[in-house]
Amino acid sequence: MADINTAQPRDWLLEMSNIDKSFPGVKALDNVNLKVRPYSIHALMGENGAGKSTLLKCLFGIYKKDSGSIIFQGQEIEFKSSKEALEQGVSMVHQELNLVLQRTVMDNMWLGRYPTKGFFVDQDKMYKETKAIFDELDIDIDPRDKVATLSVSQMQMIEIAKAFSYNAKIVIMDEPTSSLTEKEVNHLFTIIRKLKARGCGIVYISHKMEEIFQLCDEITILRDGQWITTQPLDGLTMDQIISMMVGRSLSQRFPDRLNKPGEVILEVKNLTSLRQPSIRDVSFDLHKGEILGIAGLVGAKRTDIVETLFGIREKVTGTIKLHGKNINNHSANEAINHGFALVTEERRSTGIYAYLDISFNSLISNIRNYKNKFGLLDNTRMKSDTQWVIDAMRVKTPGHRTNIGSLSGGNQQKVIIGRWLLTQPEILMLDEPTRGIDVGAKFEIYQLMTELAKKDKGIIIISSEMPELLGITDRILVMSNGQVAGIVDTKQTTQNEILRLASLHL
């Protein structure tokens, strides 16, 4: 393979050169390049807000670039829509999947281009062509199944198969493993490598460094809307990539934890929730100033614990004591009044109001407290508290009236956490808080957790990333099939021990 810096134009399948894009008051892209070869897997990396999404929207015609050129298979192009891009051989598998849940798998595969026999859809041909593609990609899904019955990983396979059916030459994958098990990730990687072997150029977007090194051949790094480098991945270290992404050296991935947890703040005994299957006889305690991790495989019911504590799920048996006093949270409002806060797993669907501004998203959990004596909202206090969230959480935004949906994932998450801090919680529960967030934003969230622990807050974090749990927590509660398999001291345990416990009740 030719060296990237001296490669000839014929070596490239896709060339995006000197791309500029500005919005009012913001230079989103400044002379950015992305060049992808056939038969390669190309990592596109950068912090949230670095310009990755804007660059790809320029490729797909969602945004019109201000200047620069896009050459695909030797021809300069300017797609008017993602549909046109797909028809020409450029496809994207989004983090938020784009499937019609109540239709069959094969309906989704051929939506808008059904094979016909006379005036009718040729169901037999549609089935056979779908099955042939699935067989070639080693996808074990019945084309006649409803999409709603499938797992997230199976839905992603359908999106990839759809790109395959269009004979896509460029396939862009945005955080494709964020909700997958290790087994599902390995299967996905097998399919990606098959696409590579057919001559596709894969653009792979992920914040998971281990995946990048395992899968990719080359890397392009963006920072603050500017192109930093495009080079072979071979020979680069994780620290070098992080340094280029954030513009500084991160000497450590996790902040130092020097404080010692204090007295017990929360006691949970024999907790069982109503919905089945769910948690059974869960017992643990949480200390002031402690960060308690919850680990477990997919289906272990980790989320059920925090949802039951927060009043989203109803408990059947068991006791919850706060400062030694029995409490029952029958609703989220009751939980908030008792000093609980929950940052949910699905940021876009249950965490933010995507089409509303930062101010609304910052204040919604505490909105009743902003009424003055006349029953009207106190706009001065609301503006002040929104600004506190922006400043304290270091949210990158033009202002408090900015639509939160336009922010990067990391900045959205900071707003959500800031929203809950305004309720002055004693117990902060975070469910996969760094999923889909870049390394710089992750470190800021870890710092925040550490600072809150120093202020005697009790913190519970659910995470599927083992290095994260081992790096930030004091103890780890391991769940297996709805039951507590063990509680371990983080400093005394290993990843293998946690995985052994997580498999105990399967």
Curated annotation (Swiss-Prot):
Q: Which domain of life is it from?
A: Bacteria
Entry GO MF terms: ATP binding; ATP hydrolysis activity
- E.C. number(s) listed in UniProt: 7.5.2.11
Q: Name one Pfam family in it.
A: ABC_tran
Record domain ABC transporter: where: 14-249, 264-506
GO CC, sorted alphabetically, is: plasma membrane
| Cell compartments where the protein resides | Cell inner membrane
Is-annotated flag, keyword Mitochondrion? no
Primary site of residence? membrane
The record's catalysed reaction(s) read: D-galactose(out) + ATP + H2O = D-galactose(in) + ADP + phosphate + H(+); methyl beta-D-galactoside(out) + ATP + H2O = methyl beta-D-galactoside(in) + ADP + phosphate + H(+)
* Residues the record lists as binding ATP: G46, E47, N48, G49, A50, G51, K52, S53
| Keywords, sorted A to Z | ATP-binding, Cell inner membrane, Cell membrane, Membrane, Nucleotide-binding, Repeat, Sugar transport, Translocase, Transport
Q: How does it sit in the membrane?
A: Peripheral membrane protein
- CDD domains to which the protein is assigned, alphabetical: ABC_Carb_Monos_I, ABC_Carb_Monos_II
Q: Does the keyword S-adenosyl-L-methionine apply?
A: no
Assembly with partners or alone: The complex is composed of one ATP-binding protein (MglA), two transmembrane proteins (MglC) and a solute-binding protein (MglB).
* PANTHER family from the UniProt entry: CARBOHYDRATE TRANSPORT ATP-BINDING PROTEIN MG119-RELATED, GALACTOSE_METHYL GALACTOSIDE IMPORT ATP-BINDING PROTEIN MGLA
Query: What function is annotated for this protein?
Result: Part of the ABC transporter complex MglABC involved in galactose/methyl galactoside import. Responsible for energy coupling to the transport system.
Say which family it is in: Belongs to the ABC transporter superfamily. Galactose/methyl galactoside importer (TC 3.A.1.2.3) family.
| Name listed for the protein in its UniProt record | Galactose/methyl galactoside import ATP-binding protein MglA
State the organism of origin: Yersinia pestis
Q: What is the lineage of its organism?
A: Bacteria, Pseudomonadati, Pseudomonadota, Gammaproteobacteria, Enterobacterales
